[in-house]
Amino acid sequence: GAAVSSFAHRHGYSVVTEFGGHGVGIDFHEEPFICHVGKRKTGMLLVPGMIFTIEPMINTGKREVYVDAGNDWTVYTQDGGMSAQWEYTVLITETGNEVLTY
């Protein structure tokens, strides 16, 4: 989370905290929740074999969002600012990491 949030904040953007990445295993959406905001060296320990997504929502304005009550899926920024989201799936290996999907 520290890398994502520090990069976004350095460039004048905010990071949504209500949504984040997740573990991938037998089921697609599994624990742990991957928060995209944090302090360096304070997050969970990454160990070989872990597979998870990194999928931050980055906003041009404030970080606050709401979900459309009509479809319970579409997310909007509360201040009407623009937002972008992308997803990577990452495998932790014995020697580092491997990006499985972009």
Task: For each feature predicted by the language model, list its residue ranges.
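Active-site neighborhoods and metal-handling regions in enzymes and metal-associated proteins
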Residues: 1-102
